[in-house]
Amino acid sequence: MVHMHITAWALGLILFFVAYSLYSAGRKGKGVHMGLRLMYIIIIVTGFMLYMSIVKTATGSMHMWYGLKMLAGILVIGGMEMVLVKMSKNKPTGAVWGLFIVALVAVFYLGLKLPIGWKVF
């Protein structure tokens, strides 16, 4: 399940940047955007399944940290969607980019720091 979740995130980020580049070039990115929305569903479902498997075995404050990681992941998805919708409507996206980047850094940090993630830190 972990590999499926990581693959879904990687594909989601790739589709996000492809859709962003299409919108910023003034072309239609609706099809890529819809594919990205499908990836959102897969990311949320696999993330929730991972969270539920962790709840069964985690001890101490691990529930809280994984809950915060899940919340930050949902903020990343919300930030991605808001950036693309505002881009398609030609509205400013500065604040939404800030939310997206801060949440993405938090998700990567927690993903690498917590026990299921890679042992970088």
Swiss-Prot record:
Keywords assigned by UniProt, alphabetized: Cell membrane, Membrane, Transmembrane, Transmembrane helix
Taxonomy, superkingdom: Bacteria
Residues forming coiled coils: none
Membrane topology summary: Multi-pass membrane protein
Entry-linked InterPro entries: UPF0344
One cellular component term from this protein's GO annotations in UniProt: plasma membrane
Regions that span the bilayer: 6-26, 38-58, 65-85, 92-112
Location in or out of the cell: Cell membrane
Family per similarity comment: Belongs to the UPF0344 family.
Annotated protein name in UniProt: UPF0344 protein BC_1150
